[in-house]
Amino acid sequence: MTNYAIILAAGKGTRMKSDLPKVLHQVSGLTMLEHVFRSVAHITPQMNVTVIGHKAELVQEVLKEKSEFVLQTEQLGTGHAVMMAEEKLADLEGNTLVIAGDTPLITGESLKNLIDFHVNHKNVATILTAKAEDPFGYGRIIRNHDDEVVKIVEQKDANEYEQKVKEINTGTYVFDNKRLFEALKNINTNNAQGEYYLTDVISIFRENKEKVGAYVLRDFNESLGVNDRVALATAESVMRRRINKAHMINGVTFQNPDATYIEADVSIAADVMIEANVSLKGNSCIGAKSVLTNGTCIVDAQIGESVVITNSTIEESSIADGVTVGPYAHIRPGSQLDKNVHIGNFVEVKGSHIGENTKAGHLTYIGNAVVGSDVNFGAGTITVNYDGKNKYKTVIGNNVFVGSNSTLIAPLEIGDNALTAAGSTITKNVEPDSIAIGRSRQVIKEGYAKRLPHYPQK
């Protein structure tokens, strides 16, 4: 049987108190809407139809070719939102999943189980439900003595008995597609909210003696719909635990998983050690047996095997096997560190390629440079790459020794095996096997200090 999906993403999300559409707020590095789409993909829908409204263009920009779009100009309830998809789906045979775009914790496995349950029980409609300790605010699932679903009652419309029911409607459903759109023609706004409730189609099916079922989630957390920043933080917490648990099962050691932030698309090999307060973001990849210490932040970077990163930040760069970075180093976008490079404390590298076994131990800036292998940077070395308007390249050969407090003014080339004397300002190219000295001779004026204000007075 063919599957389709309707994703509800038209709401403003007033309680979020944000200029951004609710479904575009992020959980673990992805928008809530992207999380939903990844889960929906597990049912292999032939067509996704996203109902958009508030700031529709922003939602379209996130999804692009992943979905068809229909516009809901007025938000008149969930039933009204699904009506908007009629032009795309009404005449098609198959099953249609209806899901809200603000449910980032729902898993693909649960949606696949929901579809299978629906098909196996030959239902015209199947509701995804959950058991809640505190069901206040949720629509209740009302069953008869034969345990069949009779109706769904919203909180504001529920009587005293119905409000005690703990089985709640998650807002996710599967319908026979044609019967869904036929039933939608018969719902109205005669309720406390004055809206078109999608849940009213369940009552219509029951009145017609059609089969309605309910599939109960194993994990209540999956049912969370995010309506405010408190729920967003809850979703973030649950997702973080879920992601970190998966990495631990795959052989990653966490010093404190509750204090480690790893986004959804990060890849980590076995035998990696991650200390507390580490953040791994974007499409970062961490190689086997690497160690990330407290305070490290890695964004969209590729980290090799047996790398040690100590309390440092690495962005959009490639780090080869055996490299050590930090503490307090910053590897900025566009950098490549080859095998066994050492970048020490308070060193910044930007847009540079650094060859194997090169060392910059402390207090150094390497920007827009191509550096060979076995180079040593003395403390305080600066590549002067910017004149206020343009950036210039520094090229350093193999086995070069750069003396402490050298200032290398680009554009500049230093040949293999060359040396720059400590304290030099280098403005011209240095030939291989040469030493470059670019500093004034020391001058000593005996007794001159007595004339200066700092000198102790008798």
Swiss-Prot record:
It is found in: Cytoplasm. Mg(2+) binds at D102, N227. One of its GO terms (biological process) is peptidoglycan biosynthetic process. The active site is at H362 (proton acceptor). GO terms for cellular component: cytoplasm; membrane. Its cofactor is Mg(2+). Coiled coil: none annotated. One of its GO terms (molecular function) is glucosamine-1-phosphate N-acetyltransferase activity. UDP-N-acetyl-alpha-D-glucosamine binds at residues 8-11, 22, 72, 77-78, 139, 154, 169, 227, 332, 350, 365, 376. Its EC number is 2.7.7.23, 2.3.1.157. InterPro entries: Bifunctional_GlmU (IPR005882), GlmU-like (IPR050065), GlmU_C_LbH (IPR038009), Hexapep (IPR001451), NTP_transferase_dom (IPR005835), Nucleotide-diphossugar_trans (IPR029044), Trimer_LpxA-like_sf (IPR011004). Keywords: Acyltransferase, Cell shape, Cell wall biogenesis/degradation, Cytoplasm, Magnesium, Metal-binding, Multifunctional enzyme, Nucleotidyltransferase, Peptidoglycan synthesis, Repeat, Transferase. Pathway: Nucleotide-sugar biosynthesis; UDP-N-acetyl-alpha-D-glucosamine biosynthesis; N-acetyl-alpha-D-glucosamine 1-phosphate from alpha-D-glucosamine 6-phosphate (route II): step 2/2; Nucleotide-sugar biosynthesis; UDP-N-acetyl-alpha-D-glucosamine biosynthesis; UDP-N-acetyl-alpha-D-glucosamine from N-acetyl-alpha-D-glucosamine 1-phosphate: step 1/1; Bacterial outer membrane biogenesis; LPS lipid A biosynthesis. Residues 230-250 are annotated as: Linker. Binds 1 Mg(2+) ion per subunit. Residues 251-458 are annotated as: N-acetyltransferase. Residues 1-229 are annotated as: Pyrophosphorylase. It catalyses: alpha-D-glucosamine 1-phosphate + acetyl-CoA = N-acetyl-alpha-D-glucosamine 1-phosphate + CoA + H(+); N-acetyl-alpha-D-glucosamine 1-phosphate + UTP + H(+) = UDP-N-acetyl-alpha-D-glucosamine + diphosphate. Acetyl-CoA binds at A379, N385, Y386, S404, A422, R439. Homotrimer. Catalyzes the last two sequential reactions in the de novo biosynthetic pathway for UDP-N-acetylglucosamine (UDP-GlcNAc). The C-terminal domain catalyzes the transfer of acetyl group from acetyl coenzyme A to glucosamine-1-phosphate (GlcN-1-P) to produce N-acetylglucosamine-1-phosphate (GlcNAc-1-P), which is converted into UDP-GlcNAc by the transfer of uridine 5-monophosphate (from uridine 5-triphosphate), a reaction catalyzed by the N-terminal domain. In the N-terminal section; belongs to the N-acetylglucosamine-1-phosphate uridyltransferase family. This is Bifunctional protein GlmU.
